[in-house]
Amino acid sequence: MDLRKKIRIVEDFPIEGISFKDVTPILKDPKAMKHTTKEITKYLEDKNVDVIVGPEARGFLFGIPVAHELDIGFVPVRKPGKLPYKTFSVDYALEYGADSLEIHSDGIEKGQNVAIVDDLLATGGTVLGVSKLVEKLGGHVSALNFVIELTELKGRDKLKGYGIQSLVKYDL
């Protein structure tokens, strides 16, 4: 399946100059969603992953089905103040700004193998921040999985040493 045909391009969103890659058409199409989940799951099958971590919000949309298929848990990473228990936090750079993320302090057990699943790899700031949170809790990042990669933003360069999968690549 050509997932590129299921990704809607929205110009000047969320701010002027950004060409937003909208994954909601994938979510709407059960065959496209099954294909996406299957491709990520296939990549992870031999990685001995114990848990999937997904950053808010679109990481939830793709990470939970992958965790379900692998019969493992899912741990959310959220914006500050959204998780009810004790958290660890990290500041990170976005393609178009800066932000912070938090994870529950008991979300990852020491020594667990973790795959981080998200919709998009742009500058790499978000996933690098999530990786730092996982490692702060004693987890090992086994894989980084993305539906989309914006290659010209060179996010992959910040993530050397990690196994990276992206299903669709765009040049800007």
From Swiss-Prot:
It is found in: Cytoplasm. It comes from the Archaea. The keyword rRNA-binding does not apply. GO terms for cellular component: cytoplasm. Its main location: cytoplasm. Catalyzes a salvage reaction resulting in the formation of AMP, that is energically less costly than de novo synthesis. This is Adenine phosphoribosyltransferase. It comes from Methanococcus maripaludis (strain C5 / ATCC BAA-1333). The gene is apt1.
